């Protein structure tokens, strides 16, 4: 009796937890794609409004939207990519890390694919908040046209408040994200259901033949409107990127039970409304609702777009942390805003970069119609990159043959390339903005990676082999350095070479500690490393120990905490009797270098932007000794 009751209680708790994950996924994962109905159909109709929209065009466009959602979101992301995880983590960099683990790090195609995908995502993280919030506030123009001039400043004010709040964390309000977004999807579904009966011909859009027929007869205009049709799936990358936060089943359940049906009903309702009232093509989303409901819907839409923006910002923070740990960016200051959830982080430099970009976009474009033309390129580009990485995943991880992997993904790849081509037609109309943003970010990441590789090669060639140094220093002679009590830890990224900071300490202080640790921190190509694989201790001589500490690319690189695990490995030391020796690099430009002059200057600027290793690795500040060294590049 008691056992049965306990089992039932556990089942209820398990179901409650699962429902909570589903609701949370709706708020975070689907916030972006859930705001697309605000503008997607309106923008797709725009090329046809001058001559009046016709049944063939409305049904064809809605059919394209339905099947774009079905093929790209349902088949590619929900059913396939959510299974292509790296120990439960998803996203472009996570998939890249898994492939590097399987195929090696020195695969240029993989490396540049990861850089491009990451850069495109950051560009998308600037455009999404600006476009979605302006689209929501523009519903106020239907209440009174006088609101039109206030949309940009109101949007900017909301963005400033949102970005300013990031440093305090979102834990206090995130519990409301899911319920508010659920309400938003119900409101969208209700708006669609009310109007589908306006013209039942819209149900013909369910037949994919109508989508193909539209493309066959629309000619060049058909390719142009594909760029707007693609707006229906912006935000799909979030499904994959947030896999680690919610898990595969809750994300899939949320899509099939609420999100997908609500989107289909809303788009069908917008189409039926325009078929029955062609003038509604000016703003079909908000015109679906009666006058008395317009203000509440605008307010709910604004909340939904703020939540969608928050999800994109959080994703950008997470991507930046992964990029830092994988060596694509310099050490950035990362603050944890929750004591219990390590996924809730704040990256001040990324926050400032995004806010600056968002405000520039709001005031440069002025309205969502203009900004929508710039949208899509970054998203389609990121999706094409993900499909390319997924092809390698099928071959390297799942063992598919080239022909089988091609058969699985080539049709999808062709569809996405067509969408990318359609979006590239908008380059002159503002599409250059996300391209320029992505190129700038990619250049920074490539320069940092190339510069770090060059410095490591330089050190490997110029520094003394560690084993030779230890043999010479352990020989007893009249010139041997004085031995002092305690432990000295020397951080280095090239563990088989003698750290310069160790040589400088000997040269200037003429002492050697009783215990000397050559410490190297490694980032593995997996999200998390368990404690039993965290450290590796190698005794090199009576006074020298090599210590390797391994972190995953989603781990907090807390070296002090990791050192506490050394006791379990038989290596004992007292933290208050330990000194951490760090080398502070001062880069000096030289004529002969492995980097072009422009890249040298960028790399030196990035080097100056990086935070101190003592802060990044959470070393006790009162136990850190820094010695300067000049490095010629």
From Swiss-Prot:
Subcellular location: Cell inner membrane
Pfam family, one: K_trans_C
Reactions accelerated catalytically: K(+)(in) + H(+)(in) = K(+)(out) + H(+)(out)
Residues spanning the membrane: 18-38, 61-81, 107-127, 143-163, 176-196, 211-231, 255-275, 293-313, 345-365, 371-391, 402-422, 429-449
UniProt xrefs under PANTHER family: LOW AFFINITY POTASSIUM TRANSPORT SYSTEM PROTEIN KUP, OSMOTIC STRESS POTASSIUM TRANSPORTER
Presence of the UniProt keyword Electron transport in the record: no
Membrane topology of the entry: Multi-pass membrane protein
Record bears the keyword Transmembrane helix: yes
Stored InterPro entries: K+_transporter (IPR003855), K_trans_C (IPR053952), K_trans_N (IPR053951), Kup (IPR023051)
HAMAP family in UniProt: Kup
Keywords: Cell inner membrane, Cell membrane, Ion transport, Membrane, Potassium, Potassium transport, Symport, Transmembrane, Transmembrane helix, Transport
GO CC list: plasma membrane
Native organism: Rhizobium etli (strain ATCC 51251 / DSM 11541 / JCM 21823 / NBRC 15573 / CFN 42)
Protein name per its UniProtKB record: Probable potassium transport system protein Kup 2
One MF term in the entry's GO annotations: potassium ion transmembrane transporter activity
Function: Transport of potassium into the cell. Likely operates as a K(+):H(+) symporter.
Entry similarity comment: Belongs to the HAK/KUP transporter (TC 2.A.72) family.
């Amino acid at each position: 009796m008691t056992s049965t009751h306990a089992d039932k209680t556990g089942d209820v708790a398990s179901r409650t937890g699962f429902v909570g994950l589903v609701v949370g996924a709706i708020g975070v994962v689907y916030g972006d794609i859930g705001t697309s109905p605000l503008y997607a159909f309106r923008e797709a109709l725009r090329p046809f409004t001058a001559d009046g929209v016709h049944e063939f065009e409305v049904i064809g466009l809605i059919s394209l939207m339905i099947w774009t959602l079905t093929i790209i979101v349902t088949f590619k992301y929900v059913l396939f990519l959510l299974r292509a995880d790296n120990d439960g983590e998803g996203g472009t960099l996570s998939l890249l890390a898994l492939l590097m683990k399987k195929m090696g790090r020195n695969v240029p195609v993989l490396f540049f694919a990861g850089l491009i995908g990451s850069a495109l995502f950051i560009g998308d993280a600037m455009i999404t908040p600006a476009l979605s919030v302006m689209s929501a506030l523009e519903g106020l123009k239907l209440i009174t046209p006088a609101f039109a001039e206030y949309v940009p400043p109101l949007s900017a004010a909301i963005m400033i408040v949102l970005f300013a709040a990031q440093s305090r964390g979102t834990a206090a309000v995130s519990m409301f994200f899911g319920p508010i977004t659920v309400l938003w999807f119900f409101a969208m579904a209700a708006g669609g259901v009310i109007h589908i009966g306006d013209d039942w011909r819209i149900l013909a859009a369910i037949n994919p033949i109508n989508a193909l027929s539209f493309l066959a007869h629309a000619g060049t205009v058909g390719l142009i409107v594909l760029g707007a049709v693609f707006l229906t799936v912006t935000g799909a990358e979030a499904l994959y990127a947030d896999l680690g936060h919610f898990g595969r089943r809750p994300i899939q359940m949320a899509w099939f039970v609420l999100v997908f049906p609500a989107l289909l009903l809303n788009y069908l309702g917008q189409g039926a409304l325009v078929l029955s009232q062609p003038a509604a093509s000016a703003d079909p989303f908000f015109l679906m609702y009666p006058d008395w409901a317009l203000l509440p819907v605008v307010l709910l839409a604004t909340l939904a777009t703020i939540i969608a923006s928050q999800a994109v910002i959080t994703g950008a923070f997470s991507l930046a942390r992964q990029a830092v740990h994988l060596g694509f960016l310099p050490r950035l200051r990362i603050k944890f805003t929750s004591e219990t959830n390590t996924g809730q982080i704040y990256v001040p430099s990324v926050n400032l970069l995004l806010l600056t970009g968002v405000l520039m976009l709001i005031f440069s474009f002025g309205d969502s119609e203009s900004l929508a033309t710039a949208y899509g390129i970054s998203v389609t580009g990121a999706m094409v990159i993900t499909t390319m990485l997924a092809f390698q995943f099928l071959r390297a991880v799942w063992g598919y043959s080239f022909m089988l992997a091609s058969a699985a993904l080539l049709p999808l790849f062709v569809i996405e390339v067509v969408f990318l081509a359609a979006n590239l037609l908008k380059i002159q109309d503002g599409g250059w903005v996300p391209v320029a943003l992505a190129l700038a970010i990619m250049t920074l990441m490539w320069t940092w990676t190339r510069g770090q590789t060059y410095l490591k090669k330089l050190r490997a060639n110029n520094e003394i082999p560690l084993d030779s140094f230890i043999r010479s220093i352990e020989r007893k002679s009249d010139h041997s350095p004085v031995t002092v009590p305690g432990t000295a830890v020397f951080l280095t990224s090239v563990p088989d070479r003698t750290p310069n900071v160790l040589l400088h300490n000997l040269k200037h202080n003429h002492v050697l500690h009783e215990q000397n640790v050559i410490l190297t921190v490694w980032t593995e190509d997996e999200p998390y490393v368990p404690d039993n694989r965290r450290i590796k201790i190698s005794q090199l001589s009576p006074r020298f120990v090599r210590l390797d500490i391994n972190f995953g690319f989603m781990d907090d690189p807390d070296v002090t905490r990791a050192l506490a695990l050394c006791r379990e490995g038989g290596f004992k030391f007292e933290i208050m009797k330990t000194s951490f020796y760090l080398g502070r690099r001062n880069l000096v430009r030289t004529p002969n270098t492995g980097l072009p002059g422009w890249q040298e200057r960028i790399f030196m600027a990035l080097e100056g932007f990086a935070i101190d290793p003592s802060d990044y690795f959470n070393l006790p500040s009162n136990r850190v000794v820094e010695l300067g060294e000049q490095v010629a590049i």
